[in-house]
Amino acid sequence: QSVCFVEDIKADLARRDFTVNAIAYSPTRGMIDPFSGAEDIKNGIIRAVGNAHKRFSEDALRILRALRFASVLGFEIEPETARAAFELREKLTAVSAERVFSELKKLLCGAAAYDVICRYREIIAVRCPLAADIPDICRLPHDPAMRFAAVCGAEAENALYALKADKATRTRAALFAGCRPFPAGEREFRIAAARLGREAAESIAVYRDVLYPECSAARINTLVKNGVCLSLDTLAVNGKDIRALGVRGADIGAVLNGLLFAAAAGDIENKREDLLRCAKVMVDKRKK
């Protein structure tokens, strides 16, 4: 659609999406608010300017924008505006994936996200598959990957791929959606954390503690506080050290991971001499 420029400020404001955005200020005339946007802000109301069906038909993304404003600001969507959003929700299928993703990630990180998702589930589901049971995502950190994982469940990665989300968000969402409970045993718990790496283990522990209270975050924090090695970058040896032992190719990574898991489990100390001694034993066993 082409954009026509108008000189009349009121005519311009009449084309805005919501009354809260249809306010202007003139140094000579002061506040220009023909649609009572200031009153709606005061009362916490999201209301379409004029005919809601017309506004949403002009750009269906406005439907998600209404939900996003309600989520972020904690506002209520005015009944007629909400009704039009439900009736025209299928128009969202024609909106580009990138624009939809941009709105959804802001919506999911809003202070009232859980309430908005529950109320307007049918609208969101047009472009984003939702799990049967959605947890209170407002208890999670403001992390789009975590929140998409929580609301989409096993479909998180596919949903984000369809929305053309960035690879990092897709990968992290898949990690959260597919994460399993941490082992109860201390040794197994340490190894599981090391397999994930410190950063991922800390994030997953927070995620699981919110959705399935396990006290995993406290356990991870204790390991970190006590200096337990949970990632290769904190291991006292590196690839060059292992290469010096005659190891080549993928075997270098295998040996390093073996040392990492042993150090995390407490089987050996994270000291260069001890690790190299253990590495030599591992290398000798591989040669036999």
Model-derived regions: residue spans:
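Catalytic cores of the polymerase beta-like nucleotidyltransferase superfamily
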Residues: 1-288
